[in-house]
């Protein structure tokens, strides 16, 4: 008998609907014990005839209706877990859901562990390990790019690629074994050059997969964008404008921002940590100076530095360069306050700086919001300098480890072939590579590894 598990499958907190999921051998007895329709208990025959259909009925506790619900019954093996599975769709009041879940426990279910439903799906062959990890990534995705990459894996991109690698490895192994076993027979085998070329192509596929995954990783890692510059250039105003709330104090008094302030936001699906820093200036105030030093460290470690300058002040090229030359390199220059631009800030002066230092300059006004959409597009291109995610694939750390091992095995096998080693020697590397590719999709016997993977899930998944 398979023990029966139950858990809340929707998010914690109030909502229109809350779903309780139950899986295991006691699904039918539990359902019959807690469901009524027109004040009459449901029958097993009725539920079997209504499988995979929505049944409107009452959920009862101690013979009294607790809630009007929609019930779904999915008999094995045609369910998410591969076991008998049921879903109770109740109104999404947390107290109501807690009481209903307690009733299910009283009738023989036990609380599910994190990821246990998906683990059962894996153990029953409904999904492979790559698919399970993709579901976890899909649920936890924090950005548009991560969601797109997770969706590709849910629909089997990793499985397809690893299946190709496995198929090619089996083909190589079969050719090597045939040569070893039938070397005295009058048979024709592929040339060593052809075999080596196949290994090189397979190794290159693994290398590309790893590199593509590293590129994909850059899409989903949070980027740090630092607003940097002298006091009163509009850093705090731009910070508040970009995050849509008054997070930084705005004042005409220099030195108002004494320390850096960080906020998280999403720029068209790109996760960003936006940092407003203390204005850079010479000061005798020790506390302000400490804030300036911390701001410089933040700027040095940023993915993108937005160096703000105040165009309402007079511009003189030589003094400007003398003051800011070291800060310009590696920065995206944001020329703020163009709504009140000083006459000395004519177009040629900006172009001169742009050409001399090969800089990108964005002209904006935080006051009128002029140039803000263009700045955001420029920032997005700086952060991504990315292509579309269409040709990329995202490997989990565990998967990447095994693909790297395969790449290493193939490199070793190629080296052995070039040194005229017999097939009996380099076939061992192919055998190890085959073991590693099995680990990618789920030929994993280690319970500790499985536990680590599925513990990342929420309880109801």
Curated annotation (Swiss-Prot):
Q: Name one Pfam family in it.
A: TrmE_N
| HAMAP family per the UniProt record, alphabetical | GTPase_MnmE
Q: Which cofactor does it need?
A: K(+)
Function, as annotated, reads: Exhibits a very high intrinsic GTPase hydrolysis rate. Involved in the addition of a carboxymethylaminomethyl (cmnm) group at the wobble position (U34) of certain tRNAs, forming tRNA-cmnm(5)s(2)U34.
Residue sites binding K(+) per the record: 232, 251, 253, 256
Q: Where in the cell is it found?
A: Cytoplasm
- Which Gene Ontology cellular component annotation is one that this UniProt entry carries? cytosol
Give the source species: Leptospira biflexa serovar Patoc (strain Patoc 1 / ATCC 23582 / Paris)
Determine the domain of life of the protein's source: Bacteria
In the record's cofactor note, how is the cofactor described as bound?
A: Binds 1 potassium ion per subunit.
Quick check: keyword Hydrolase in the entry? Answer: yes
Provide the TrmE-type G domain boundaries.
Answer: 222-384
User: Which protein are we looking at?
Assistant: tRNA modification GTPase MnmE
Where is it predominantly found?
cytoplasm
The UniProt annotation places (6S)-5-formyl-5,6,7,8-tetrahydrofolate binding at: 21, 87, 126, 461
User: Top EC class per UniProt?
Assistant: hydrolase
Q: Which Gene3D superfamilies match?
A: P-loop containing nucleotide triphosphate hydrolases, Probable tRNA modification gtpase trme, domain 1, tRNA modification GTPase MnmE domain 2
* Binding-site residues for Mg(2+), renumbered to this chain: 236, 257
């Amino acid at each position: 008998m398979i023990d029966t598990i139950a858990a809340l499958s929707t998010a914690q907190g109030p909502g229109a609907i809350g779903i309780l999921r139950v899986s295991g051998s006691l699904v039918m007895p539990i359902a019959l014990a807690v469901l009524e329709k027109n004040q009459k208990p449901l029958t097993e025959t009725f539920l079997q005839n209504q499988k995979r259909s929505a049944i409107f009925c009452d959920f009862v506790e101690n013979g009294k209706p607790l809630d009007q619900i929609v019930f779904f019954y999915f008999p094995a093996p045609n369910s998410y877990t591969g076991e008998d599975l049921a879903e109770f769709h109740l109104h999404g009041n947390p107290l109501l859901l807690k009481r209903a879940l307690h009733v299910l426990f009283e009738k023989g279910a036990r609380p599910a562990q994190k990821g246990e439903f998906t683990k059962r799906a894996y153990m029953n062959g409904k999904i492979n390990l790559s698919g399970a990890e993709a579901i976890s990534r899909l649920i936890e995705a924090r950005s548009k790019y991560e969601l797109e990459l997770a969706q590709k894996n849910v629909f089997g991109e990793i499985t397809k690629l690893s299946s190709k690698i496995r198929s090619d490895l089996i083909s190589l192994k079969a050719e090597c074994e045939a040569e070893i076993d039938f070397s005295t027979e009058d048979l024709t085998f592929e040339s060593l050059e052809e075999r080596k070329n196949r290994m090189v192509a397979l190794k290159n596929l693994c290398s590309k997969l790893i590199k593509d995954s590293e590129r994909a990783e850059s899409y989903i890692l949070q980027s740090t964008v630092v607003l940097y510059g002298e006091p009163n250039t509009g850093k705090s105003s731009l910070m508040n404008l970009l995050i849509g709330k008054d997070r930084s104090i705005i004042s005409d008094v220099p030195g108002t921002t004494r320390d850096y302030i960080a906020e998280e936001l999403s720029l068209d699906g790109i996760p960003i940590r936006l940092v407003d820093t203390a204005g850079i200036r010479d000061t005798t105030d020790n506390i302000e100076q400490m804030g300036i030093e911390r701001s410089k460290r933040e700027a040095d470690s940023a993915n993108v530095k937005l160096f703000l300058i105040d165009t309402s002040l007079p511009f003189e090229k030589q003094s400007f360069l003398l003051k800011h030359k070291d800060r310009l390199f590696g920065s995206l220059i944001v020329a703020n306050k163009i709504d009140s631009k000083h006459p000395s800030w004519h177009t040629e002066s900006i172009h001169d700086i742009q050409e001399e230092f090969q800089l990108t300059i964005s002209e904006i006004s935080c006051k009128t919001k002029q140039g803000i959409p263009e700045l955001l597009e420029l920032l997005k291109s700086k952060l991504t300098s990315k292509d579309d995610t269409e040709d990329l694939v995202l490997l989990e750390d565990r998967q990447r480890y095994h693909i790297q091992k395969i790449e290493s095995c193939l490199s070793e096998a190629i080296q052995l072939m070039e040194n005229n080693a017999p097939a009996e020697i380099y076939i061992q590397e192919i055998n190890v590579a085959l073991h590693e590719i099995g680990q990618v999709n789920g030929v994993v016997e280690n319970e500790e590894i499985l536990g680590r993977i599925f513990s990342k899930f929420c309880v109801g998944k």
